Amino acid sequence: MSPKKVQIKVEEKEDETEESSSEEEEEVEDKLPRRESLRPKRKRTRDVINEDDPEPEPEDEETRKAREKERRRRLKRGAEEEEIDEEELERLKAELDEKRQIIATVKCKPWKMEKKIEVLKEAKKFVSENEGALGKGKGKRWFAFKMMMAKKWAKFLRDFENFKAACVPWENKIKAIESQFGSSVASYFLFLRWMYGVNMVLFILTFSLIMLPEYLWGLPYGSLPRKTVPRAEEASAANFGVLYDFNGLAQYSVLFYGYYDNKRTIGWMNFRLPLSYFLVGIMCIGYSFLVVLKAMTKNIGDDGGGDDNTFNFSWKVFTSWDYLIGNPETADNKFNSITMNFKEAITEEKAAQVEENVHLIRFLRFLANFFVFLTLGGSGYLIFWAVKRSQEFAQQDPDTLGWWEKNEMNMVMSLLGMFCPTLFDLFAELEDYHPLIALKWLLGRIFALLLGNLYVFILALMDEINNKIEEEKLVKANITLWEANMIKAYNASFSENSTGPPFFVHPADVPRGPCWETMVGQEFVRLTVSDVLTTYVTILIGDFLRACFVRFCNYCWCWDLEYGYPSYTEFDISGNVLALIFNQGMIWMGSFFAPSLPGINILRLHTSMYFQCWAVMCCNVPEARVFKASRSNNFYLGMLLLILFLSTMPVLYMIVSLPPSFDCGPFSGKNRMFEVIGETLEHDFPSWMAKILRQLSNPGLVIAVILVMVLAIYYLNATAKGQKAANLDLKKKMKMQALENKMRNKKMAAARAAAAAGRQ
C-alpha cells in the first residue's frame, strides 16, 4: 500500500493599504508593484490536509530563477524599509556566509575557468546587493559603514602584499632563470640578492655615521697634512694610473682611514667621530653575525621535520600548474619550471637506485683527492712566492716597475681563483658522486683554496704592517728633529728683540708617517676591484665569445660544435658562489680601514646581477646533470658564517694589539684603538656609571658569560635535534597508520565481495 500524498494549502491575508490623498501618489503606486506584495507573509492559516490533491509539478529553471530574483528584490526593498523579519534575516545570513565561502575557495574547485568566473561574479554580486540588509534599525548605517571599511581594509592589505611582491628586486629575472636552468642555478642569484641587502645595510651605516659627518663637519682638504697630498706627489695625484691604484687624491679622501681627524668632537653638533668610527666598525661585524645566524635559523625552521617524499610524482602531476596564469610568457616559464622539476625528481630517484663498483670508486676518489692536495699546495706556494716578490718590489723605485710588477700579487690570486675551480671540477668527474654531494665537495675544496690564499695574503700583509710600524718610529724621530731644526732656523732669522710673522709650514711640506691602516685598506680595495675585472673579463671571453664562435661557426666546421668540443658553457655554480663568499670576506676584513668598501661592493653586486643574468640566459646552457638545490641554502650560509668568523679575527687582532699610526686616522695619539671607549666614559659619563661599565668588562665576568652562552647554545641545539627526531617519528607513525587503514579497507572490501558471491 503506497503512502498517500498530502499537500498543505496556505491562505494569505493581505494587509490593507493606506489611502493616498494625492492623485500623483496614486499614479506612482499604479506604476510600481504594490507594497503589500513585497512584504513577508505575516498572517498564515493552515487548512486541513487534503490527501486527494494532486502532486505539484516541478518548476523549470526559468521559473526558479524568476522566483529567486523576486525574492531578492523583495529582500532588498524590505531592507530599505526595515521590514524583514527574523526568519528571513537568518536565511539571508546563511546565504551570505555560503557565498563568501564560495568566493574564498572558488580557485580550488576542479572546474573550468569559465565556470569559475561565472560563479565568482554571481557570488560577489549577491554579497554586494544583500550585505546591507543584515543591519537593523538605527544600527543599519553603522553596520554598512563597518562592512565597507572591512572591504576597503581587505583590499588595502591585498594591494599592499602585491606592492611588497613588486618591490622585491630582480624577482622576475630569477624566476625566468629558475624555469630554464633549475633551482640550483637560481639559488646562486637568490644568494646574491640576499648579499646585496646585507651590504646595503653596511653601506648605510658607514656612509651616514662616518663618511658624511667627516665630509660635512670635518676640516676640509688641505687643512692638515693627513688631508693633503705630499708636495712630491702633487704633479701626478690626478693621473688615471695613480687613481686606479687608489693613490694620489683617492688616498687622501674620505674613502680611507687615514683622512679622518682625531678630534674628539667635530661640527656644531659636537659629533664624536672617533667613537662613531669604532662603534660602527664593531656594529657592522655584529650585524653581519646576527643576520647570517637569523637566516640560517629561519631556513632550519622552514625545513621542518624533513621532506615528505610520499607520492612525489603524483603531487607534481596534479598540483604543479597554476590555473590563474593569464600571461603567455609566464605560462611558458611555468611550463619550463615544471619540466625542470620533473627532471630533478627523476635524477634524485635514479641516484638512489644506482649500483656501484665499490673498489673502483674508492680508488678513483683517492686519486682525485691526491690531485686536489697537490693543487692546494702548489697554489699556496705560488702565492707565497708572489708575496715575497711584492716585498722586493716595494723596496724599489715605483717608476722603474711595470704594470705587472705592481699588480702581480693581486693578479696571481685572481687567476688562481679562476683556474683552480676548473681543475677541481675535472677531478670531481673521477669521484662519480651524486650531483648535490659533488657540488658540496667542490665548494669545500674551492673554499679551502680561497681561504688558504686569503690567509697567506694576510700573513704577508702582517709582515708589511710590522715593517710600517718600525718605519713609523724612525719617521717620528726624524719629524722631531725636523721640527727642532725649523724652529731653530726660524728663531735665528730674527734678532733678540724683534717680532716676525707667525711660523707657518704648508701641510704638503710636512713629513709624515707611512700610515699602515690606509695601506691595508688600499690593498683590500685593489684586490676587490681586480677580482671584479677578472670576473667580467672571464665571462666576456669564456662565455660570450665562446658562445658566438659556437653559434656562427657551427655551419662551416668539421664537427658539431654545439654537442662536441667546445660547445656552450654551463653555469659554474661552485665557482661563482665561492667567489661571492670570498669577496664578501674581503669586504668584512677591509671595511674598518676603508669605509668605502661596502659601497664599492654594492656597485659590484648590482652590476653582477644584470651582467650574470644576461650571460646565463644568453651564453650558457642548462647542466647535463640536473639536481635539485637544497630547500634551505644553509650550506652557502654556513660557509659564509665561517668566512665571516675567519675574516673578523685579523681585524679584531689589529684593533686590540697593534698601535695606531701617530699622524693619521681618528685614533692617532692613542696607544690602542679601543682606548676611545675609556676616553668617552671618562669625559661623557658620570664616574659611577664608568665604574660599573669597567666592572662589567672584567675578563672573569666576560668568560663566565661566554661559557653560559655556549651551554645555552648546546642545550637549544640538543632540544632542536630532539624535536626534529620526534617529528620524524610522528610522520613514520602516521604513514604506518595510513598503511594499516588501507590494508583493513582492502580486507573489508574483499569480505563484502565474498559474502555477496556466497549469497548469489
Swiss-Prot record:
Chain positions with Phosphothreonine modification: 45, 400
Lineage: Eukaryota, Metazoa, Chordata, Craniata, Vertebrata
Reaction(s) catalysed (UniProt annotation): Ca(2+)(in) = Ca(2+)(out)
Localisation per UniProt entry: Cell membrane
Xref: InterPro entries: TMC (IPR038900), TMC_dom (IPR012496)
Family the entry assigns: Belongs to the TMC family.
Domain-related comment: TMC1 is structurally similar to TMEM16 channel and may include ten transmembrane (TM) domains with the ion-conducting pore placed between TM4 and TM7.
Record topology, Cytoplasmic segments: 1-182, 304-359, 431-434, 554-572, 620-633, 735-760
Compositional bias ranges of the Basic and acidic residues kind: 30-39
Keyword vocabulary terms for this entry: Cell membrane, Deafness, Disease variant, Hearing, Ion channel, Ion transport, Membrane, Non-syndromic deafness, Phosphoprotein, Transmembrane, Transmembrane helix, Transport
Protein name, UniProt field: Transmembrane channel-like protein 1
Residues spanning the membrane: 183-220, 272-303, 360-390, 403-430, 435-469, 516-553, 573-593, 597-619, 634-657, 701-734
Residues exposed to the Extracellular side: 221-271, 391-402, 470-515, 594-596, 658-700
Tissues where the protein occurs: Detected in fetal cochlea, and at low levels in placenta and testis.
Annotated segments matching region Disordered: 1-80
Self-association and partners: Forms the MET channel complosed of TMC dimer (TMC1 or TMC2), TMIE, TOMT, CIB (CIB2 or CIB3), LHFPL5 and PDH15. The interaction of TMC1 and TMC2 with TOMT is required for the transportation of TMC1/2 into the stereocilia of hair cells. Interacts (via N-terminus) with both isoforms CD1 and CD3 of PCDH15. Can form a heterodimer with TMC2, TMC5 or TMC7.
Keyword field contains Transit peptide: no
UniProt membrane topology term: Multi-pass membrane protein
Compositionally biased intervals (Acidic residues): 13-29, 50-61
Domain of life: Eukaryota
Gene Ontology cellular-component annotations: external side of plasma membrane; stereocilium; stereocilium tip
